[in-house]
Amino acid sequence: MKANELKEKSVEELNAELLRLLREQFDLRMKLNTDQLAQAHLVKQVRRDIARVKTVLNQKAGA
């Protein structure tokens, strides 16, 4: 997910995306801890996507 794509979305869409990513992160962590996750790099990728969404939300709140 690119930051430019996120900047075009509304605050409501960003909040929905953040909620979806947090749920996905939870699911990935559960699978990782129970040795059901073969693609461990997805945890890092989702964590960074969450950071991108939060950054754009903070930028929109300040503007």
Curated annotation (Swiss-Prot):
Alphabetized InterPro entries for the sequence: Ribosomal_protein_uL29, Ribosomal_uL29, Ribosomal_uL29_sf
Gene Ontology biological process terms, A to Z: translation
UniProt keyword list: Ribonucleoprotein, Ribosomal protein
Tree of life domain: Bacteria
Alphabetical list of Gene3D superfamilies matching this protein: 1.10.287.310
Family classification: Belongs to the universal ribosomal protein uL29 family.
Protein name according to UniProt: Large ribosomal subunit protein uL29
Gene Ontology, cellular component aspect: cytosolic large ribosomal subunit
Stored PANTHER family: 60S RIBOSOMAL PROTEIN L35/50S RIBOSOMAL PROTEIN L29, LARGE RIBOSOMAL SUBUNIT PROTEIN UL29C
Species per Swiss-Prot/TrEMBL record: Psychromonas ingrahamii (strain DSM 17664 / CCUG 51855 / 37)
A GO molecular-function annotation: structural constituent of ribosome
Keyword Nuclease attached: no
